[in-house]
Each structure stands twice: as C-alpha cells, then as structure tokens.
C-alpha cells in the first residue's frame, strides 16, 4: 500500500477539490429542470452578505448539501438553489461602522478575513459591501462543494423579486393579516426603528416580556418594585435598591414613583415620564416603605446585586421563596424572618432557606440556578397557603380570600388584577434576554409603537392554520418540534416595516420599507422560476398581482393576463409549470436561533398565502459550531474564515467535521485534532484504492467482509434518511476502517494475500456512501477506479441481503472474545507462555443455558430458573447457579451462538489461525472432560472453554 504524508494529502485534497468543482460547473450537473422524475426541493437560509463566511456559517449549508446529494443519489431530481439577502439593516449598519472607522471591525476585516487594505474603505458603500461579500460567499460555497443550481441566484433588492414581495404583502393585507396598530417592539433609540433578530449584534431576537410593578408607598413617593412573582407579595419583608445607582422621583403611570434613572429613560418609550428629581440609592435607605397588601412598614435595604438597568431597578424581598433574598438578608444580619406564602408538598415552609442552607451557593450564578429551580417547582406544583389571609390588611381580606388555595399561575393573575384595580400596581415591558444591542451598538429597549404596520401572528384563524401546517410537517430532529409549537403559540403582532434600510416599499404605504425577516418567508417559491424570469426578460411592471396569482395559485384567465401584462401565454404557462413541478418545498434547513422568528414566520406565511397542498413538507434544524471548545467571537479573536479553513484542511475534511461531529441538534466542537483524524481516515481509504495486486481466493474472510459491507449499507441508509449523520460517519469512516483491518489480519493469519476483488468492492461502495460527505475525493477515486460517469449522479448503493451472513459474523466475534479472554489471562501469567490449550465443553449443558436465557429474557429470577430445572444434588445446584450467573454477564454474541445450535468445537477450531496470528502462540483445541476437570481444576461452560496457558 502506498503511504502519503499528511501535509501532502491536504495539498492533494485541495487540488482534487478544485478539479472537480470546475468539472461539475463546466458540465452543469447540478442544474435541475422539471422532468418525468420524482423531485426533491431543498433550501438553506440565504445569507446576509455583510461579511465573509466563517466556520460557524458552514454547518447549516454543508448539512443541507449532504442531504441534497444523498437524495440526488436516491434517484430524486434535486433542486438546491441559493440567493442573497440584501434587505434590512445588517448591511447598512455594517457599512456605517466601516465609515465610522470602527477599529475592531476594521481589524477583523484586515487581519482575520484578510480583506485587501484598498478594498476596506469601499465597504462603507452598502451596495459595494453587499456585492463584494456576495462574491466572496459564493466562492466559499463553491469551494466547500455545495451542489447549487446557480442559474436561480437572485438578491432581495432585484426589482423582479420586489414585485414578488409586493404580491405577498398584498395577499396578506387582503386576508387581514397585515394591520396598523399599537404594539410593543424591540427598538433602537438611536435609529428610532423597530429591531428584530437580524438587526442586532450576535443575531439575538429581542424577547419582550412583562413585569408586574408593585407600588410600595413611602414619604418620597411609591417605590416601584418590578417582579415576575406578584403572588408572593404577601411575604415581601423588605425592598432592595442598589446603593451605588442613581434613582429618580418621577411622575409615571399617573402617580409619583421612584425608579432607577435607567428605568426612567427606558419607560419613556412605553409611557409618559416626567422626572421630578434625582436621588442616590443610598438616600433611599433612610426611609421605609409600606407593603400595599399587608399595610406593614418594611425597610429599604442596600443590594449590589440589584441591576438598575433591569425593569425598574427596584426589587421586593421575599426570603421564603427567593434564594437571593434569603442569602443576602442572612448575610446582612438584619434579623428578618421569612414569611411563607406558597406551599409545595414535600417542601418546608421556607424552601428558599432550605435550598440555600443545603446547597451552600458560592456566588450569584449558583443563586440564579437555585432561583430558577425553585421558581419552576413552585409554578408547576405550588399552592397558595390558606394562612396568607392573616397577613392581609382588613380592607383587602375579603377581596383576596379567593387567592388562598389556588395554584400559583392562577393566583399570579388574580393578585396582579387586584393590584392594578386598586392602583397599587401596573405592568411594564422589558427585554427579557437583555442586553441586546442594535448593530449600531446601542442597547435595544421596548417601545410601545403606535400607527405601525404589523404582521398579526396573533390572529386566531392564521395561528390555527400555522399550527395545522406544523402538524403536517416533518421536523428534524423531532425533539425540536416543541420549540416550534412554543414559538407559534407565543408569536403575536410583529412589526414588518422600517423607514430605513434596503428593501421593498409597502405597496399601500410607500414611506415604509418591508423589513428583512418579513420579506424572507416565502422566497423559496421564487427560486422555482427566477431563472425563467431572467430568460424571458420580464420587467417588474409585468409581474403584477394577477400575474403572480396565476403562476403561484393557478387563478385567472391566462389569455387575459397575457394580454394585459404583455407576457406570452407560453411563457406564463412555462412559469406555472416550473412552479407546480417544484412546489411545495420538501425541506428547509436552518439553525435553532431562527425557530422563534424566521422559521415560524416561514410557517405562518405559507399557511396564510398558499393552499394546503403547497405547504412546506419539512424543516431541519442543526446546532452551532464551537472552535476548540469555545464560541467563535470577535473578543476571543477565534473566528476562523471558512475559505481559510478549507485551504488548511481540505474541503472534504471540513464538510465531514461540520456535518457529522455530533447529532443534528447538538453544538459541534471543531478541533484541529478532530480535523486531522478525519483527514487520516480519508487518506487511509485513498491509499486502500491503490491496492491493485492481491489474490482471487474467496474464503471465509472475504465472506465476512462482504457481509459487514452489505450490512453497513443496509444500516446507514435509514440513518441518512433521518439525517443522523454522526452515526453514518462513525460507520463509514471509523467502523469500516476497522473491518478492513480485521479482514487483512484474517487473510494474513491464513498466510495469503487479500482478495483484490473484495477490496475493490469495498472501495467502490465506500466512495458512493461517502459521496454526500466528501464529494471531491470520492469523485476522484471513482474515476481512478475506471469509471467515466459523475459519481455525484450515480445511484445510492443497495444492500445484497444474500451476502449478509449472520453466522460468519457471529463466529468471528466469538473468536475476538476468545482472544480477549486469553489476553486477560496472559496479563497475569508469570513466565514465558508458549502455547494455549482451549478445552471446549461438549454441549451437554446447552439446553440448560438456553433455559436460563429464556428465564432472564422473560424477566424471571434465579428462583424461577431453579423451579424450571430442579437440581437433584448440591453439585447440580452449584452448576445451575454458575450457569445463571454466566448468562447474566453473557455477551450478545455468545447468546446468539447458543441459540444458533452450531457445534462449538467446529466454531472454535475455525478461529485457530486468527488466534495464533494475534497471540503469536500455538493454539490447541481439545475436548473438556471430567478427567480434565479433575486434573486441572478448571470449569468450562458452553462457549466458555477452560483455558490453560503453557
């Protein structure tokens, strides 16, 4: 076998990749058109071209391509297109940062992405940036081997695509799904624009949640304490403020209140705020507050853990049910006792106290975990204590009596309603996953937006359709379905237009531009005919609402539409034919961060516009990529550009690492050591292809290897179908390599050469199975094996079940077990061994062993076994006990051999050549007899021979 040095193999991989990318492009093998063949239409989210691709981007695209290539080999006519998302604020904001001379960004562009110095200033022009990075991303996609039909490429600012978006929004408006309303949104206070996931740094979706604000009256005004657990107000024994923060006395919510300075600034975006004066947190410690439910005076205490930027910056202290509160009250030694409010069966009166004192938290992070644990427990299992009414002031007791004994969720709503009715509380909105930053660098706040256009995802009719679509859709992995269900439930009104950014104007209110997560929900439909729109030279003015109604929905008179829009009937029918052939979309690939936004919007918009037969059929979600165990980030300077990684390791190595290191839903950790291990295994198979000599002997080793190969084909095919790529690669790259090593040892043990035909069969089959993962190397190997077709277009292997031989595989596994047992004895053997004697049982106990296995398999016990096989003597009882102990530890291989009824002596003798070769000792196989037992004082059982080392 020829051995190639590792560094030379990487160079070879890059040469091979370039060669076959050019061949695929030249021969246009991934261009897909309607034909008399079952179709498979798949897409991956098109990228924002505001920076080059890094390793983290690659996983979703490669995973999508692996599956597309697999389906192509399974006989499907596969369409995998790509476009580019120019609209929205990501590109404009990044260009602004270049124009401002953002040092961190310029450093990353120059020193990590290696963008030429003369190009960087030009990136301040948004369109230059978009087009420059579009070409760079396209190059990365080609270099990583994506099997894309590039004829269909478009950008979201192409006028023809804008005409499609106009149609989409006109349909939604007519159905009542686009509304003008007042609603909370994430908001950039600098740009004065709504902010969604793709407008933020790190692509974080601003999650808007609700705090209940409870007014604790004081001589300076009401301390506005924000809480997520208003039902625990009965046990509030103090108010926390941050002594180092600045607070304001202000008129908010129609009364004089005290909130942090930061809170007052944020609340201006939700309600009227009039600041009267500023006070320090330490000044507030000099006054007392009144619990509005109990009427008791309670102290105001200092707490550095109170974040003045979160909610109101004022927190009530409930030490019975808040681990933070109990921990810090105890530390402050103020002598305040917890007051229990919520009861959980099996828990003490003050569960926060019990948790803290049993867990010994070392820091705030530990306290946060305990808090989440207790909050979850009490929310799900807690009941309001009946004795809380003794805490309530007289005038509220009757009104609050309904709360006693209620479950926590119900009590929470009741208490909130009563507080608001009594003007003792209100609600405020907050970014729950704060801090979230706009791409311009400013922190996002919540704004109550008036006269804004929204997609009304809370519309009951629309929501029901979306849920029906999800129910009909395949979700990979299935466990992410619950995340989709939660998102569809949670979504309400969503701002769908901006006054800034690239994009399509709202057709009925052109001062607004449709935002980037709203114009990217049904664009997959546009792929089906984008190349034909170019081919026919259609102008946006021809792509009217009735034109799209005909193409997408089959509505209208084609001749009349043709005449009015000056599009030939044949062209319209051709566009309709292409759309109806490819749609619905079969599979959509994306990341988990897009479930609560893009992927849910994708479901809603398809459900809202298209009939059920055109609803998407599936969605696949994969986890993120870590680099050497850490998230890639600018601050860590560990961003690895995708094109650089390809040059360093080879495209196929990167493809395998990105798609197959872990299960789909898990985050994958890319490491240099892991990449090298993948490269070494690829090299091993490439070198195996060079094994041209060998013999034509076709014996047991060949039958065994063919059996393992065809079993592997049979097993990995359903794994591929369910996108369990980690398990597939484990079989193809690691297990199959082990099988080949075992086969070569088997033939060497027979003092002969390998069979060249079986090696070729293994290599040919492997190239097909690995083609979706390592398309470049396998294409090269396929041609070196003498084929002149494109492997990418070959059929997926089918197993020959007649070649799967369970018995031969079992016998070989048994021989390996014997080797392990002998080695275990040799490890403790004193002296130099020369031979091993194996004394094989005569099989007289086989039926008894089967009986023990039957009892065990049916859930029986030793007692059941003894009743079934009544011993006639103490010796028989001892043997039966040994047998039962034996079968409880018996390997699966031996169990199968026991049931197969083959002759143990024959099976053992077949393994002698391999045992001799592996152990480098003489092996003798002898019959186990009573004389042997008495002479050697050794026991044997079926398939557990007595072993004697000489």
From Swiss-Prot:
Reaction(s) catalysed by this chain's protein: tRNA(Leu) + L-leucine + ATP = L-leucyl-tRNA(Leu) + AMP + diphosphate
Intervals of motif 'HIGH' region: 47-57
Motif 'KMSKS' region: chain residues: 631-635
Gene3D superfamilies reported in the protein's UniProt record: Class I aminoacyl-tRNA synthetases (RS), HUPs, Isoleucyl-tRNA Synthetase, Domain 1, leucyl-tRNA synthetase, Valyl/Leucyl/Isoleucyl-tRNA synthetase, editing domain
Presence of the UniProt keyword Nucleotide-binding in the record: yes
Domain of life: Archaea
Subcellular location: Cytoplasm
Record's GO cellular component terms: cytoplasm
Keyword set includes ATP-binding: yes
Binding site for ATP: 634
GO MF assignments: aminoacyl-tRNA deacylase activity; ATP binding; leucine-tRNA ligase activity
PANTHER family, per database record: LEUCINE--TRNA LIGASE, CYTOPLASMIC, LEUCYL-TRNA SYNTHETASE
Protein name: Leucine--tRNA ligase 2
Species per Swiss-Prot/TrEMBL record: Metallosphaera sedula (strain ATCC 51363 / DSM 5348 / JCM 9185 / NBRC 15509 / TH2)
Gene of this entry: leuS2
